[in-house]
Amino acid sequence: MKKIFFYVVIMISIILFCLGFINKESRNEYTNDLEGTLSYGIDEIPKHLGKVTNLSKRHEDIVCAVSKGLVSKSEDNKIVPSLASEIIKDSEGIQYEFKLRDDIFWSDGSKITPKDIVDFFKELIKEEDEENIQALLGVYGTKEFKAGKIKFETGVAIKGTENSVIIRLNSKNDNFLSELTKPQYRLRKYLVMWANITKNYNALIYSGDYKINYVGKDNMTLKRNEKSSNNVISNINILNDDSVEMSMAAYEVKQRDIVINPPKSELNKLAEQQKLITMPEMKATYLVINNKENSIPIQGRREIYNDICKAIESYQNLNNKEFEVAEGSFFREDKQDLTKLQARKVSSNKEGEWAKPQILTLLCEDNNENRILSRSIQEWFKDNTNITIKYSLVKEELKDEELKKRYDMLLLNNEANISDKQNFYSKFKEYLTDNQNKLLEKPIIYDYSSLEESLFDNYNILPLVFYNENIAISNKISQFKLDGNGNIDFSTLK
């Protein structure tokens, strides 16, 4: 009997021991804990969240977490109502009526009204830098109000009704709603106080899914706005990490749940562990080949572009998470147009003679993306051609017109926003030929195909890569999305 009892005790002990391992294993699996806390690092805790001029994309994320706009942009670039429940546009495309939802509240429990939004737009027009509020400056009377020439209430076509905000533009603007989705247009009360968020965060009320609960030198905490209509995670802890390597080290010991753009050396491992989310972003890089008194003929520019594309493809084959090669498309979405791509491929393969130089010089802004591209191009040319690439990485010097003229090529970063081609091509204005500038400066232009073909035929401005946003996630997270502007959509975190 004693022997049987002994064996029973041994068996129970073994079972309990194994159950302990099972429980331990289950704790390593994803758990959707809405009452928990998510932590991630950024390179600096912001002291202000007023003007967006000097805010990084990660600082903009905070504005998006604690405030909402009339509309937002989904990850697939669709305009969706946010504070608005419905958007009515008149037949001329000039007047917009935003009907507000019934269930929108400030974090103190008071209802968000049309007057709140009108008052915010009034303050935003006064306080924000002009380049950041182009959508509102296209509204009737706003430029005169900003210049102090008229009163807002009587001269600006932004009006509130009982449950709507009505805005009338000077002229049709197909990008108006898209612009309104940007962080600067998100509803913030007492905007001037946001200029010193460290001091004033506790005195503010918030329109978003979160409110700022604490701001210090080393971290900021966001707490769920109990008045929000979205079911979101309870707390977000944003910590000051001097580098992404520091964030990654903390992630490895489970002190960070999110690492945005982790070191490229970690990407393959994270992907294998199914802890990496890769999403397309608008950031892209383009090659400008200077036409210094026709020093490089068309055939030369064609071959240089082809070789640089080969260099980048060689790097991308080993690092396929960082970016997508452009393959002759100025916008990522255009890569679906196989007819256009095939025509450009045929054009780029034309053969001819030209006097190849021993050295080609390359200038670009000093950032991580350009360092990788420049080094890859240099190494590939060294191994595969008789041309030496000498590149320079600069900061403020990139504004020096004379300096840029002394280089054969430039790498330029731009936002490849297919819905705002006017702004996209305007950023290349100084590098366009006279004929190309005439195409760009037409009073009304919706079809940019002639300009694009001219750029490609002349080989003066050419697409290279479209970047991806890579995010490492912990076991706490099963879903993570960026909105159409590249900001974290905290409402989708699960």
Give residue ranges: language-model regions:
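A structural "hinge/loop" feature
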Residues: I42-V63, L83, S110, F176-R186, ...
